A protein has these predicted regions:
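Charged, compositionally biased interaction regions
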Residues: 1-289
C-alpha cells in the first residue's frame, strides 16, 4: 500500500478478527496516517485477487467501518481539514464458522441475516451487459469499465478542475457547485437504472486516465484513493457504495469545505525530452498526466 491505503492479509480465529487487526495497525507508528484499510484472506500484492474479494465478499450493510475525525497525513490534500480525516475499514475476509452471519453461530447466539453470496454459497450478483450499455450512454459519462460484475468505474469531464501541474490555490465556487451537481445527478441516474440494486460499487473519477490502457489497475488504485475523502465523497445507501474520486475543486460554500489542491509532482518537459533521446519504449498511457 501507500499512505492512503493498506491491504492487509489477516488470520481469523474469531469472527470479525480482521477488523481488530486493522484497528491495531492504526496504532502502529506511521500507520496511524492511513486513510483506507482493506482486510483480506488473499495475497495483498495481487490486485486482481483484491478486486475479486471486494466483489464477492463485501456487503456494504455490514462490512464497512468508518472512523470519523481521526488523525490524517500532512501529505493528504483531499481531507476536509489538514491532518484530520475519516478512515474506512473494508472487511473482505471469509466468514468464520462462529460468525452469526454464517448460519451456524455458537449455541445460544442468534443468526444474523446475510446474503447467500456473502457466505460463499452462490456467485455474487452483478449487472447485465445491457444495463452496462445503458449506463455508458448516459449524458456526461466519458467512459466506463466494469472491473467485476458488481463494480463499475465511470469517468467524467469536470469543468474548472485543478490543473495537474499547477493545482488550485483559491476557491472556485461556481465550478465546485457545478461539479457537485453533476456528480449527484449521475449517481442518481445510475442508481435509477439499476433498479435491482445489483451494482454494489460505483466509482466516479476524472477522464484523465485510459480505462482500457496498460497499467490501469495500479493507476486506479492511486487515483481512487488520493482524490477521495471518506467524510465527503463516500455514500453508502441501500446496500450500495458510491465513491467520488473526481479532483476536488477548492470551495468554502458547499456542504463540506474543500481545501486548496496541490499540483502533482511531475518531471518537467526538458527531462522527458532528454530521456526520449535514448529511443526507449513510449510511456504507458496511465503513467502520463
Amino acid at each position: 500500500g501507500f499512505h492512503n491505503l493498506a491491504i492487509v492479509k489477516s488470520k481469523q480465529r474469531y469472527p470479525r478478527q480482521a477488523r481488530k487487526t486493522c484497528l491495531g495497525l492504526l496504532g502502529a507508528g506511521q500507520m496511524m496516517f492511513l486513510k483506507i484499510l482493506v482486510a483480506t484472506d488473499e495475497e495483498p500484492s495481487d490486485l486482481n485477487a483484491l478486486l475479486d474479494v471486494l466483489n464477492d465478499r463485501v456487503d456494504p450493510k455490514s462490512d464497512l467501518t468508518i472512523l470519523d475525525g481521526m488523525v490524517g497525513d500532512s501529505l493528504e490534500p483531499a481531507s476536509t481539514y489538514e491532518n484530520i480525516h475519516s478512515k474506512l475499514i473494508i472487511d473482505a475476509t471469509k466468514l468464520v464458522a462462529a460468525d452469526p452471519r454464517s448460519g451456524n453461530p455458537l449455541e445460544g447466539s442468534p443468526v444474523e441475516v446475510c446474503p447467500p453470496w456473502r457466505k460463499g454459497e452462490e456467485d455474487a450478483p452483478g449487472i447485465s451487459e445491457s444495463l452496462l450499455d445503458e449506463i455508458s450512454k448516459l449524458d456526461g459519462i466519458e467512459d466506463c469499465l466494469l472491473l467485476r460484475n458488481s463494480m463499475l468505474v465511470v469517468t467524467v469531464e469536470i469543468e474548472g478542475r485543478p490543473n495537474p501541474r499547477t493545482g488550485a490555490q483559491w476557491p472556485n465556487e461556481e465550478s465546485a457547485e457545478a461539479q457537485r451537481s453533476k456528480i449527484t445527478q449521475l449517481r442518481n441516474l445510475i442508481w435509477q437504472l439499476d433498479s435491482q440494486k445489483q451494482l454494489r460499487w460505483l466509482f466516479i473519477t476524472d477522464n484523465d486516465l485510459d480505462l482500457h490502457g496498460e497499467g490501469i489497475n495500479r493507476r486506479l488504485l492511486w487515483q481512487l484513493t488520493s482524490r477521495f475523502a471518506v467524510e465527503r465523497d463516500l455514500v453508502v445507501e441501500e446496500g450500495r457504495i458510491f465513491w467520488d474520486a473526481t479532483t476536488p475543486i477548492p470551495s468554502n460554500e458547499g456542504p463540506s469545505p474543500v481545501r486548496r489542491w496541490p499540483g502533482i509532482t511531475m518531471h518537467d518537459p526538458e527531462t522527458l525530452e532528454a530521456i526520449d533521446r535514448f529511443n526507449l519504449p513510449p510511456w504507458p498511457n496511465n503513467l502520463v498526466m
